[in-house]
Amino acid sequence: MKLFIDTANVNEIREAHSWGIICGVTTNPSLIAKEGRDFKEVVNEICSIVDGPISAEVISLKAEGMIEEARDLAKIHKNIVIKIPMTAEGLKAVSVLSKEGIKTNVTLIFSAAQALLAAKAGATYVSPFVGRLDDIGQNGIELIKEIVQIFKNYPDIKTEIIAASIRHPIHVIEAAKAGAHIATVPFKVLEQMTKHALTDVGIERFLKDWEKVPKKS
């Protein structure tokens, strides 16, 4: 499974990229707004750090506006992927953009039916929201499993599944077990994934043992 980082903070992106584990970035208007910087400036800088798919979201709600924004965003860098909301208008936009060779990531997916429609419209990626489904008492990982099964049934579907709205390391592991192609993970969760109490204990023990080794004067 591939790992993307879900943030617009360039310091977090640089750090995670230095670990050699991420191959893409997802952003959204909320994440960009937190940075307090010009949208295109942030996206440009992200593209200079990570040589992989960089998702940038449109804000228009009508297909015509989405298409216009998408064409403009696609000019920023060859790695730009356009995030489109899962609506009927969004599907119209995805259909047009896919024919123009512009990659799309259909976001805010909460059902297998939505994922199937997005794939049929030509989406490069679909992003089912695991955590938000869990928040309302549904099972986000079960949705990933459903979508994976449907896509496997039809080899002509080339759309990749991005497990999104990841809240903790267990979500990442369960998404991997379910067969998601990608998980897009907040930096704090990536940090959590590096840690285990027994690892810390082991390091401390090694250092104490090393101190006991006679040193040549």
UniProtKB/Swiss-Prot annotation:
The keyword Zinc-finger does not apply. PROSITE patterns: TRANSALDOLASE_1, TRANSALDOLASE_2. The gene is tal. Its EC number is 2.2.1.2. Disulfide bonds: none annotated. The keyword 4Fe-4S does not apply. Transaldolase is important for the balance of metabolites in the pentose-phosphate pathway. One of its GO terms (biological process) is carbohydrate metabolic process. Its main location: cytoplasm. GO terms for molecular function: aldehyde-lyase activity; transaldolase activity. HAMAP family: Transaldolase_3b (MF_00494). It catalyses: D-sedoheptulose 7-phosphate + D-glyceraldehyde 3-phosphate = D-erythrose 4-phosphate + beta-D-fructose 6-phosphate. Belongs to the transaldolase family. Type 3B subfamily. It is an enzyme of class 2 (transferase). Keywords: Cytoplasm, Pentose shunt, Schiff base, Transferase. This is Probable transaldolase. The active site is at 83 (schiff-base intermediate with substrate). GO terms for cellular component: cytoplasm.
